[in-house]
Amino acid sequence: MLKQAVEHRGGFSFENCQRNASLEHVLPGLRVPLARKTGTTIAGLVFRDGVILGADTRATNDSVVADKSCEKIHFIAPKIYCCGAGVAADTEMTTRMAASKMELHALSTGREPRVATVTRILRQTLFRYQGHVGASLIVGGVDLNGPQLYSVHPHGSYSRLPFTALGSGQDAAVALLEDRFQPNMTLEAAQELLVEAITAGILGDLGSGGSVDACVITAGGAKLQRALSSPIEPVQRAGQYRFAPGTTPVQTQEVRALTLELLEETVQAMEVE
């Protein structure tokens, strides 16, 4: 029986870490799965006529870039969109579920869906799974109450803010938004600020990259813009790396004959009734 050597006095508790290490030592073949870093930079802000959302386009698998043109701005309703950070499959399926529910809600009520309704569906779903669904979401849209922007976290908590950013590159993006955001900004100023915020997240985080996608939502509808800006240009090769045959000398060469064994093969006809 393991006993606690030091009395716990508050603060961080590492009892589970000690338990996992003991189980790995006692049980052969048991390995506790490691947590993987999910890299993304998403942001959004409210301007004078609506809401603008932005995201990078890099999808990673641990230290490998899995997709250079990943769509992280998801459709919910004609005037409501959602940015997703975290596990790509979780964000995709969670937003699809919300979009289908809002379509059924609009058909049954005969009214346009509200941003607060989408946020409630998302946070209740995420709270039900207690954080095991890795989806950090930014919901933005325009309804009868005007432009609204919400951030929803994986455990179900949410906030309504004039601007926000989530993901592994959120520190650089939030720093730029806090410094330059102003109420009642024009569309041009808001779009420029959003692109610079996502670019700051891309340049300051290895998990973020690719180009900048944006979605402008107003009372007249939404406009999704792919590859609005590409902060990182591909590096051009300095020269031609084509070598003529025989450039690399052959030190030794050996030819071995393969021993083949001939097997007898028979084919039997299948009985057909």
Curated annotation (Swiss-Prot):
Gene3D superfamilies for this protein: Glutamine Phosphoribosylpyrophosphate, subunit 1, domain 1
A single cellular component GO annotation: proteasome core complex, beta-subunit complex
First-tier enzyme category under EC: hydrolase
Propeptide regions on this chain: 1-39
A Gene Ontology biological process term: T cell proliferation
Subcellular compartments: Cytoplasm; Nucleus
Record-listed N-acetylmethionine modification sites: M1
Its job: The proteasome is a multicatalytic proteinase complex which is characterized by its ability to cleave peptides with Arg, Phe, Tyr, Leu, and Glu adjacent to the leaving group at neutral or slightly basic pH. The proteasome has an ATP-dependent proteolytic activity. This subunit is involved in antigen processing to generate class I binding peptides.
Name of this protein: Proteasome subunit beta type-10
Organism of this sequence: Rattus norvegicus (Rat)
Gene for this chain: Psmb10
